[in-house]
Structures are given as C-alpha cells and as structure tokens.
Design a protein with these regions (language model features):
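Active-site lining segments that contact anionic ligands and/or coordinate catalytic metals
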Residues: 6-7, 24-26, 114-118, 135, ...
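A structural signal for short secondary-structure junctions
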Residues: 57-59, 111-114, 140
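PLP-dependent enzyme catalytic core of the Aspartate aminotransferase-like
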Residues: 5, 98-102, 124-167
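Catalytic cores of large soluble enzymes that bind and process phosphate-bearing ligands
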Residues: 53, 57, 84, 88, ...
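Conserved PLP-binding catalytic core of the aspartate aminotransferase-like
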Residues: 77-135
Length: 167
C-alpha cells in the first residue's frame, strides 16, 4: 500500500517471539526510500542513532535466525513448528472462551477468538489483574493483556475460574 502510493516507509520486524529468542533482541529495520540519495541520508542518520544507542549489537540471535532462514531443511522445520503453534494458540482461544462461558462469564467473548497472536486483551482492569496475580498466581499486565500461549489443557479450568472470581 505505501510502496504503490510512492510513500517512503520503515518496517520494524522482531524475531524474538517467532524464534523463541527472547533475550537476544533479534530484529530488523527495513527502510524504503524514493531514491538512492535519500536512502543514503536515512542510512547516515540510522548509523548515528545506532552508534549512540548500542554501537555493536549482539550477533548470536541474528546468526541463529540467519541460519534457520537460509537452510532449507531448518526453515521448513521452523515454518511447520510455527504453524503448529499458531493452530494451538487459536484452539486455546476457542477453549478459553468456552471455559469462561462454563465459568459463568456473561456476554460476547468473541473478541478473544477474533484477536490473533500470543497475547489477548482480556478486558480486565488493573485491579482485576492485580487480584489474578496476588490471589491466583496468574500473571498478566495491568492493561488486561494475557498470554494465551501460556494457557493449556492442564491450567485452562483454573484460569477461567480465577478470571470469573475477579470479575
């Protein structure tokens, strides 16, 4: 959309979650500019920002990602594992909605299944999230964001019961 409109743009990509490299801070900044002169100016400014902030980033995570993406067998394995995780998280979203309904939570919970990714905004407020932590040992941030990837068949009922208790 931006490219076809002739707009310059930047895209920040993180590989931390999709490669389970949380402590490595692996990512990329891709920049599209109108011409080579503008690209050179942007690159110059980015180099200044990089030098000021961290100078030499760690390379281990980047090397892992590069190896996986450029080795066909490893890339295929990674893509299959990623697809499996996406499916599991999608199934957990559905199971979470079903469990919350069984726990007596009223209303439309379809927002949980319509969201994508490892996290979901639960609609819980800061006080409710603090109660989940202190009373039930269930952790999320005060904005109500919870990690759906951490929900599984073994803890689903306990999570749903705890959410019902704090509402």
């Amino acid at each position: 959309m931006f490219l076809s409109s002739g707009l310059d743009f930047l895209v920040a990509t993180s590989f931390s979650k999709s490669f389970s490299l949380y402590g490595e801070r692996v990512g990329a900044l891709s920049v599209v500019c109108a011409d080579a002169d503008e690209a050179a100016r942007v690159l110059s400014q980015l180099k200044i920002a990089i030098r000021t902030n961290y100078s030499n980033p760690p390379t281990h995570g980047a090397q892992v990602v590069a190896t996986v993406l450029t080795t066909p067998a490893l890339r295929t394995m990674w893509e299959e594992e990623l697809a499996g995780m996406r499916l599991r998280i999608k199934e957990m979203r559905t199971a979470l909605v079903d469990g919350l309904k069984r726990a007596g939570i009223p209303g439309d919970l379809s927002y949980i299944t319509s969201q994508v990714g490892m996290f979901s905004y639960s609609g819980l407020n800061a006080e409710q999230m603090q109660r989940l932590r202190s009373e039930f040992g269930i952790y999320g941030v005060d904005t109500g964001r919870i990690c759906v990837a951490a929900v599984n068949r073994h803890n689903l009922d306990a999570v749903c019961a705890a959410i019902a208790a704090v509402i």
